[in-house]
Structure formats: structure tokens, C-alpha cells
Amino acid sequence: MGQAAWKGFVLSLFDYKTAKFVVAKSKKVGLLYRVLQLTILLYLLIWVFLIKKSYQDIDTSLQSAVVTKVKGVAYTNTTMLGERLWDVADFVIPSQGENVFFVVTNLIVTPNQRQGICAEREGIPDGECSEDTDCHAGESVVAGHGLKTGRCLRVGNSTRGTCEIFAWCPVETKSMPTDPLLKDAEGFTIFIKNFIRFPKFNFSKANVLETGNKHFLKTCHFSSTNLYCPIFRLGSIVRWAGADFQDIALKGGVIGIHIEWDCDLDKAASHCNPHYYFNRLDNKHTQSISSGYNFRFARYYRDPHGVEFRDLMKAYGIRFDVIVNGKAGKFSIIPTVINIGSGLALMGAGAFFCDLVLIYLIRKSEFYRDKKFEKVRGQKEEDNVEVEANEMEQELPEDKPLERVHQDEQALELAQSGRKQNSNCQVLFEPARSGLQENAFVNMKPSQILQTVKT
């Protein structure tokens, strides 16, 4: 028995099992299935492969370097500064040319400051006082300019004044001018040189045209047809970012310069081109008290006596952030097979949906359900039925088969209950039989026929 079991197991390893298909002649379900197949196929071809290019291996670990250079000059003539010519060393910070740089467009200058004793500026709450006890000596003025000396300085007969402080005097008191100091900054140019590399594919490129013409960068400007001349006019960048130059030059702001690289390496390297986008990154709402961008810096000097003094400058301007992003794709068999397999799985989901419609939703669903699902008894149940049938046959007389006994019993019962009615007698003819014999049973469908005869 054990050897037979093992033999059957070993032989079963070489069996091939296949599905049994039922062809349903339903035009509605068939049409639905073809529509689903066509939809999935179009999704796979158009969206997955043509648009998303999911047959490619993608590299998003972009390595990038940015070098910037600003050029231009501006002339001013003010009461405080007199006639002055401004060049890149005056208005570009930092001068190294990094991916974040600042261009000064407006200034508030407080010249000739020296360390000493003076009054705090009005309008600073912690620096206001009514008497000397309001100014604690040695304390710094919150959001102010120096350390309190302990004295309250009042002008004339006023009851309110400001604390005396030790600071760089005189303190900054001027307000913002109504017009930007460097109006001509709109015509400055910015040269943005970008080098990128995708390490997975060992692919490198720059946004500057490879040419031997030394005068190319001196004569060209960026345009939609000249992508490899990354020289931008400052006013154009601000306009492309959706801002007004005179407004942003007065109070300052932050502009984002985005460089996008989307490279299909299945094509030639000439098809891998940079794309530029510009937007304003800071809070540009006019009602906000924190709008704009500014900071302070100083230039220090010494007088003939060796005493240090400085010119304090509060600079307003535009900060530019150069942000580089990108990805590269190249054909790979692995993502291709994965996406084809996903499409085939969607095909199977479509067939499953059509099965649900066929066996549950349409008018003849019960008929198709009976054809699709076949009930088969297990081997043990078949053996039990066969044993019971054999036992019943052995209990009957040999000359009376099982179906004949059933007929005799029915005829006897009807004869005992029969009676005459109006000199007529109901005679029960032998019932008609139909059916097939399965497992020693006969499926009987008796059809009793009553016939009236005269006596």
C-alpha cells in the first residue's frame, strides 16, 4: 500500500493540469469584456509606456554644481552719498558666485558711527522711559541698539523720553526711501553656469553651449530658442516670476530660479536639455509686516588718531536661490517585465468582473451559473452510496427488481382506497416511468393517469 501511494505521488508530479473554459454566448458580456480589454491595453500602451515611460530604469540622484556671475554698473547722486558709481563689488553679496546670491537694490546709510553715549531711537518700547529708574544700567535694549546707562533723556518739557545707551552713535534713524536707490539694477545680467551628472548611467552635461567661439557668451542672451546661453536679464527674471521690479527692488524679496533636467538616455545626448522656471519664494502679500528682504552690514575705517568708525548700511535687495532638480531614464528589461505583468493582471481582473456580471447580474445568470459550476462528489461519498445500493438489492427477492416493488406497493394502496362512484370505477393504470439508473438507484417520475371506464 505504501509503495503504491508513493508511486502515485511520483507519477502525479508529471501530470499537467489545465483550466476548463465555458464559452458563454452572451453578446452583452462579450462586448463588455472586449471594452475592458481595450481600455486596459490603451492604458498600458499610452499612459504606462508612452507618457510615464515605465519601461525605463530611473536615476534621480542628480549631482549638481552651480556657478553664478552678475555684471552691471549703476550711477546714483544723493545728498548723503553724493555722486557714486556702483559695480558688482558694491552690490553683489557674496562675491564668490554661489547658488544663493544677493543683489542690493536699495540702501539706508548711517555714516560715521562711533562707539559712545547717545539716546536710543524713538519707537522702541523697551527704550522708552519717564524717569531714570525705567532705565536699568547695564541692561540691553530689547530690539534696540545698545546698553542702558541708567539715565532717561527727555527733550524740553516732555514727560516721556528714551534711555541713554552705550552704542554705535548716532543710531540708525532714517526710514525707507520712496524709490529704490539702484533703479538701474533692472538691466543687470546674471550668468548661471550649471554642471550635472547622473551617476547610475555615468552621464554628464552642462547648460553652456560647447563651442570654440570666445565671443559667444559676450553677445548672446537667454531665450526659448537659445537654451544654452544662460545669461539672464535681472528685470526679465523678476517679470517671469510674476513680480514688479520697482516694488521688489524697494523692499526686497526672494526669487527662485529652478533648473529642471529630464533626460531620456535612450535618445541622443542633444535631447537632454535644461528647462528654466522662475517664481517668488518669499511672502509677497502687501499687508504682511514681514514682507521683503533686508539685512545690515558695515564698512569700518580709522581716523588719523586711530579711532575706529564705520558706515552702517541697511541693504534691501533680491536674493536669488538657484534650485536644480532632474532625473534620467534608460531602457531596462526589469521594469518592462514588471509593468507588462501588471497589465496582464489587470486583464485577469477584467475577466473576473465579467464573470460576476455573467453569473449574478444578467437575466439568464442562473443558467450560466449552472453551466459554469459543476458539482462533483468526493470519492468517499461515492463509495458510501454504492455500498448502500448493494445492500438494498440483496434484501429484495431475486425475481422482483427494486422498481417493480415500488410499483406494486403504490398499486396496492390505491386499490384498497378505491370505490365506485355513479356506477363508474376509477382504474389506476400502471404509472409511466422515466429516468436513468445511477449507482443502483432509479430516478422515478411517476405520472398517474386516471381513466374512467363503465362497469
Curated annotation (Swiss-Prot):
Which body tissues produce this protein?
A: Expressed in a number of tissues, with highest levels detected in heart and kidney.
Q: Note the PROSITE patterns from the entry.
A: P2X_RECEPTOR
Q: Which residues bind ATP?
A: K69, V70, K71, T189, N294, F295, R296, K314
List glycan-bearing residues. Answer: N77, N157, N202
* Keyword hit for Transmembrane: yes
Give the GO terms filed under biological process for this record.
cell surface receptor signaling pathway; chloride transport; osteoclast maturation; positive regulation of calcium ion import across plasma membrane; regulation of skeletal muscle tissue regeneration; response to ATP; response to calcium ion; response to pH
Anything known on activity regulation? Activated by ATP. Slowly desensitizing. Not activated by ATP agonist alpha/beta-methylene-ATP. Highly sensitive to the antagonists suramin and PPADS.
Per the UniProt topology annotation, the Cytoplasmic ranges are: 1-30, 363-455
The family line of this record is: Belongs to the P2X receptor family.
Question: What does the comment on domains in this protein's record state?
Answer: The second transmembrane domain and the conserved Asp-355 are essential for P2RX5 subunit assembly.
Name used for this protein in its record: P2X purinoceptor 5
Q: Whose protein is this, by species?
A: Mus musculus
